């Protein structure tokens, strides 16, 4: 077992909410380490939609998931957080008042005063369509997420699904692709009406195809797709020519070890009080999509707000004898000094 790393705060999850929490904690002189099961920083933003536009970040009309991640990393540079990627927290043990010993599946041990769970909905994996032999094509010509749009330039793409992800990527990839076919099991969609309207206009213009049915088999060799057999609503089978398939059937969310950390759970979410977003265990907080409370909105901006209030309470655990004086970055010379702006 590795020697324990001592830190003020350990954040579990390096998505946008976890990253902004570093900023709020750093302003209050708390040192932070972050652990994430993914191999990259940014959580779902980086893993699932790095190039997908986000429109509801205050003051930023449009930013991609990757762009938001990069901006947050730039913002927290002055606080020099340490990241531990490809590691999953397995256990949290109380060792003081306050104080916790946290152990990962890599054998790394942390000793900290505060734990912040910012793990989104837990670990996630795409739902795989029930198509025989699809595994042989995965990551070669079948993909469950778009990480680089340029990868799909001049491709003949079959997009499968009827939700927002399927419609969004149909519209976003349309200018790049050689041809796009959208396939859904029925001619009704669970996506934003504006997106559905745009898609139907492209179909009417003849620049893309819409088919109703389900994929029953794939055609190709050595992982390289040449087509997909589709069974229509009239039970007839046809072949859709494609060299790339993007199935968007949603995600399977798994809490994993979170369920064993002694935290109360409601429908796989962690209940918190809304003054500081603390859990039933003093010193353990939950922010972002992993938590629940009356009126909760699963928005990145909500997680930012939660992180700011969490940091105020965390300060009491890390510095129990130090009075916290609230300050503004616009007027506080000490905060500006921490940020390196004066």
From Swiss-Prot:
It catalyses: 2 reduced [2Fe-2S]-[ferredoxin] + NADP(+) + H(+) = 2 oxidized [2Fe-2S]-[ferredoxin] + NADPH. Its cofactor is FAD. It comes from the Bacteria. The keyword Cytoplasm does not apply. It is an enzyme of class 1 (oxidoreductase). Keywords: FAD, Flavoprotein, NADP, Oxidoreductase. One of its GO terms (molecular function) is ferredoxin-NADP+ reductase activity. Signal peptide: none annotated. Its EC number is 1.18.1.2. SUPFAM superfamilies: FAD/NAD(P)-binding domain (SSF51905). Binds 1 FAD per subunit. FAD binds at residues 17, 36, 44, 49, 89, 124, 289, 330. Homodimer. Belongs to the ferredoxin--NADP reductase type 2 family. HAMAP family: FENR2. This is Ferredoxin--NADP reductase.
């Amino acid at each position: 077992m590795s020697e324990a790393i001592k830190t003020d705060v350990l954040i579990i999850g390096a998505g946008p909410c976890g990253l902004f929490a570093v900023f709020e904690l750093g302003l209050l002189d708390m040192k932070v380490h972050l652990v994430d099961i993914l191999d990259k920083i940014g959580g779902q933003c980086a893993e699932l939609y790095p190039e997908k536009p986000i429109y509801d970040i205050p003051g930023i009309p449009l930013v991609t998931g990757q762009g938001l991640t990069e901006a947050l990393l730039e913002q927290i540079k002055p606080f020099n957080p340490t990241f531990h990627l490809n590691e999953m927290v397995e256990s949290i043990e109380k060792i003081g008042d306050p104080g916790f010993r946290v152990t990962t599946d890599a054998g790394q041990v942390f000793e900290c005063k505060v734990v912040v769970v910012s793990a989104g909905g837990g670990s996630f994996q795409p739902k795989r369509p029930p198509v025989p032999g699809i595994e042989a094509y995965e990551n070669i010509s079948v993909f469950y997420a778009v990480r680089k749009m340029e990868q799909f330039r001049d491709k003949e793409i079959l997009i499968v699904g009827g939700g927002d992800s399927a419609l969004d990527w149909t519209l976003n990839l349309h200018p790049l692709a050689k041809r796009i076919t959208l396939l859904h099991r029925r001619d009704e969609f669970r996506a934003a009406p504006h997106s559905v309207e745009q898609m139907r206009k492209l179909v009417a213009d003849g620049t893309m195809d819409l088919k109703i049915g389900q994929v029953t088999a794939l055609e190709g060799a050595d992982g390289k797709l040449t087509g997909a057999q589709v069974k229509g609503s009239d039970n007839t089978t046809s072949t859709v020519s494609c060299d790339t398939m993007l199935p968007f059937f949603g995600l399977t969310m798994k809490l994993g070890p979170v369920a064993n950390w002694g935290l109360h759970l409601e429908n796989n979410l962690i209940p918190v009080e809304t003054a500081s977003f603390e859990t039933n265990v003093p010193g353990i907080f939950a922010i972002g999509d992993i938590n629940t409370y009356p009126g909760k909105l699963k928005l990145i901006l909500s997680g930012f707000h939660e992180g700011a209030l969490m940091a105020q309470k965390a300060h009491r655990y890390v510095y129990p004898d130090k009075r916290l004086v609230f300050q503004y970055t616009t007027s506080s010379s000490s905060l500006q000094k921490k940020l390196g702006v004066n």
